[in-house]
Each structure stands twice: as C-alpha cells, then as structure tokens.
C-alpha cells in the first residue's frame, strides 16, 4: 500500500470521526430543545447528552458511511454514490396539545441549527487559532477545519430537504405544506427517493452550490479573524 493510499485512509478515518461527531450533535440538538420545551422522553432515554455515541446508529452512522468512504479508496474506483449517513432518531412525545405544532417545528429545526453552530465553531477555531488557509505548516489542521465547515453545511442543507425521514419533511407537515396522507405516502418511498436524488448530477450540482453558499460566510469570518 503506497503513501498516497495510506494518507487517503487516514483522512477517511478523520472524515468518519467528524461525521459521527456532527451527526451526534445534530441529534443532541433535537433532544436538548425537546427537553427545554418540557418533553420528558429524550432525557428519560439518555439522549440529552453531548456524547455522540448515545446518538449513533451502528448502520447509519458508522457502517454505511465507512463503506462509502473507504470502498473507493481501497478499490481505486471513483465514488459513485453520495455519502449517506444518519443517527439514532430522537423520540419525542409532544404531550402539550396547545404547543404541539410549535414544539415540533422548534425541535426539528434544532438539528440543522446545531450543524450551523458547528460551522461557526470550526471557523472560530480556524480564525482565532491563527490557521492561515495557505500556510503549509497548518495544512492538515486547515483541511480538517474546512472539512468540518463543509460537512456541517451539507448536513444542514440535506436535512432541510422536505422528504421523509429528513427534518424538512416534518417542518413541511407542520406548516401545512403536506397533509398527513401526503406525508405518510412520501415516507414509504422517502429513502429510495433520496438515494436516487443524490445520484442525479443536476441535483448534486444545485445542492453543492447551496452548500458552498452556506459555507462561504464562515470562511469569510475565519479570514477576518486572522
């Protein structure tokens, strides 16, 4: 195994760790806001914690992302699929009928919002840490932090797509864009729809543009802090 492949494996491992942390904090966001809104279920199930492994799904957070990251590296083939990953869903009870709609919207938005907070965090570390983008001595750290910004911008954008089981679909349901029947019909085919979508070049191109647009302000902040 040559040095280039070993370097790719090393960055693949770092990418997987970054994904586990980012998905874990995304799910923590849901649990934390549910707890703030008076829902006892996430705390009772041990989900109001920053420990990412409390939010890890063995298949969705580790196995499938690892397969998609490392298969192209080990086989030398181009990556044919977008990276798919998910955490253990946070269960909520929405006990208060008077605030149920708003509670659900706020709890749902908390996940992507946490990813935006992570974008900010990586940018602050880069800027306040004095890690210049073109400094060869800081290349590895910069690459990791840049990956953190892009990954979390991607998670925020992807999760707001209004297709079940993504967060955007619950927001669409609560805003009346979907009826309950429409939501349930989409939910039956949601995973397949998403799998097809992320492998359509036009869709991937548009999503890439949106992700870059969302990531750009954080890189500007990073640069301003240097």
Indicate where each model-derived feature is located.
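Hydrophobic transmembrane alpha-helices and their immediate loop junctions
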Residues: 1-226
